[in-house]
Amino acid sequence: CSFVKTDGKKFAIVSSELVPIYGYYFNGGLGIKFYRPKSEYRFMYAGDLPKPYIFGWNKLPTSGERVFITGGEKDVLSLAAHGFYGIAFNSETAKVPEDKLKELSERFKEIIFLYDSDETGIKESKERVEDFKNRYNVSRLQLPLEGSKKEKDISDYFAIGNTTEDFVELINEQRT
């Protein structure tokens, strides 16, 4: 892919077997997000990034039992593949806009922060719940994963053999 920056300079992004790149368009095709899993800087953007950036928002139903706020797009897709609703902001460290949380609370009975099981994910999900617990029905779900690069998020949880039923059971266990 090649682009022209706002300063008029051209640049290109090239994928190879050694450096794969995945991308998807957002914001009506006005922007693109690249994921480079083997690069030091794994994420890149080009075009117009909506503010706030929320992946999955337009796929949410008007109402429902629960919605998950996750750390990334892959998490949202993994949840959807198992019949759950989710969204992701730009990262786990992104601040959740109060107006969006208010809207979610009007549409869903519960909002669950489902961040990675690493140090950052645990810290940030605890902070989000602390920030909003007195105003909205928010909680956090801690996955029983070691928090390593290979075992930290919901896609890893399902990849190691857990089922949709196991996930529902985990939700119910942590609720009590």
Annotated model-derived regions:
Residues 1-108, 124-125:
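Phosphate-handling DNA/RNA-contact segment within nucleic-acid enzymes
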Residues 63-67, 73-176:
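TOPRIM fold recognition
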